[in-house]
A protein has these predicted regions:
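Von Willebrand factor
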Residues: 19-129, 132-134
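Acidic/histidine-rich, surface-exposed loop or edge segments in extracytoplasmic proteins
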Residues: 20-35, 97-104, 168-176
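P/S/T/G-enriched low-complexity
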Residues: 18-26, 174-207
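Hydrophobic beta-strand segments of well-ordered beta-sheets in folded domains
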Residues: 19-24, 58-63, 131-134, 162-176, ...
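VWA/integrin I-like adhesion module and closely mimicked acidic/polar interface patches used
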Residues: 140-189
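Positively charged n-region of N-terminal signal peptides that target proteins for export
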Residues: 1-4
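Hydrophobic h-region of N-terminal signal peptides that target proteins for export
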Residues: 9-18
Length: 207
């Protein structure tokens, strides 16, 4: 009997250790079409819903906005644990509704895009358990690291990452949205290089 109890305890511990985390980063900078186009916001919300629906009981979803480093609203990070009571459908509904509401919100746009800072300083990615970091962003870093126009024109690249994201899937939904193909290629190449140096597996979704 004791042996059975021990086996069950170890099994539960193993399952807990393998729980994945889905971190959803929402770009509130003014260049992101998410803030101005309802159709884009809807498509982004549907993609997020699909990813949430892949999760299992015990997995974690955390949501955080980013843009300007001095904006207090970016400090909040609502966190949900998938369970029998809190199913993926409910979590997806809450987050989807928020994303779709963004184009209707006034004065929400922030003047800069600190995407690198978000990736390097946000805690809880849980990359050791093959988790995912899903960014809803046009991927135009516009910060003290590099100006947006410099990046888009290929005049200056992204700095070397100061973070270990080995084991994480890093997905950018909306990379280069609304920009010409040449700019999209530059952004994709830069973020692919940055992600590889950080140890992450990078995917760009260009709707």
């Amino acid at each position: 009997m004791k042996n059975i109890a021990l086996i069950l305890l170890l099994s539960c511990a193993a399952l807990s250790a393998q729980a994945k985390t889905l971190t959803i980063g929402i770009d509130l900078s003014g260049s992101n079409p998410l803030l101005s186009h309802g159709n884009f916001a809807y498509m982004a919300s549907q993609y997020v819903t699909t990813e949430i629906n892949k999760l299992q009981n015990g997995d974690i979803v955390q949501v955080k906005t980013f843009g300007s480093p001095d904006n207090a609203s970016n400090v909040l990070m609502p966190t949900f644990e998938i369970s029998r009571r809190l199913k993926t459908k409910k979590v997806a509904g809450i987050i989807s509704q928020y994303i779709q509401s963004l184009p209707e919100q006034k004065d929400i746009a922030q003047p800069s895009t600190n995407l690198i800072a978000f990736l390097e300083f946000t805690s809880g990615f849980n990359c050791a358990d093959n988790s995912q970091v899903l960014m809803i962003t046009d991927a135009i870093e516009s910060s003290s690291y590099v100006g947006g126009n410099q990046l888009l024109q290929g005049k200056k690249g992204l700095p070397k990452p100061d973070i270990d994201l080995k084991g994480c899937l890093l997905t950018f939904y909306g990379l280069g949205a609304g920009f010409p193909p040449q700019a999209v290629r530059i952004l994709r190449n830069e973020w692919t290089r940055w992600s590889e140096q950080a140890g992450a597996t990078f995917t760009a979704i260009i709707p």
